[in-house]
């Protein structure tokens, strides 16, 4: 606002400031929204501010359609993941719809193989829930346990009992996609979206998927 005293700032000054900061500098929608919110707070609480009824529109966040893998692409992805630990991680992300943080926090005693249940602690919204272990995952899970023998977590780093990391998962997922010749921008969350999409295609109730 070019050093203008707060008491002299009027609505038009704020509008021009927003335009200069956000539009001309091509800030992201999220940053634009933060600037608008900050200016509204400033106008509301500053004792000498003369701005009245400041109306600033927060730009709507862009809604991009999520990237989804086809069933064949999922098969190709897993076939090209040679390391059994990596394959177990990707298979569980897809077959259970877990978020990457939920998988990293998953402990062995949260997995009930006989009942095919996985207990997810502190999921989104800090809610606990159960997800079903796919029958097709059981043998891979057994082979993985026999090979790596993790101590506490479902997937661990080089040191026993220490959690694996998200960058490591993203790294081997990227390599597997390259080997499978999948040109989409695939992230661990893509596997979750793919899981939900494939359930919908099979006629599973949307409310069940959302839970």
Residue ranges, per PLM feature:
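Conserved catalytic core of the tyrosine transesterase superfamily
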Residues: 1-211
């Amino acid at each position: 606002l070019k050093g203008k005293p707060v008491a002299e700032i009027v609505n038009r000054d704020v509008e021009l400031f927003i335009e200069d900061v956000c539009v001309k500098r091509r800030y992201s929608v999220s940053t634009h929204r933060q600037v608008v919110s900050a200016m509204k707070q400033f106008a509301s609480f500053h004792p000498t501010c003369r701005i009245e009824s400041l109306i600033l529109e927060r730009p709507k966040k862009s809604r991009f359609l999520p990237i989804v893998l086809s069933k064949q692409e999922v098969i190709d992805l897993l076939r090209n993941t040679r390391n059994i630990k990596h394959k177990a991680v990707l298979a569980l992300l897809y077959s259970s719809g877990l978020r990457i943080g939920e998988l990293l926090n998953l402990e062995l005693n949260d997995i009930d193989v006989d009942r095919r249940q996985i207990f997810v602690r502190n999921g989104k919204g800090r809610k606990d829930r159960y997800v079903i272990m796919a029958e097709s995952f059981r043998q891979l899970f057994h082979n993985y346990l026999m090979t790596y023998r993790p101590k506490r977590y479902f997937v661990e780093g080089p040191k026993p009992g220490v959690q694996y990391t998200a960058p490591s998962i993203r790294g081997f997922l990227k390599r597997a996609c390259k080997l499978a010749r999948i040109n989409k921008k695939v992230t661990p969350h893509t596997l979750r979206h793919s899981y939900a999409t494939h359930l919908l295609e099979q006629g599973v109730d949307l409310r069940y998927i959302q839970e």
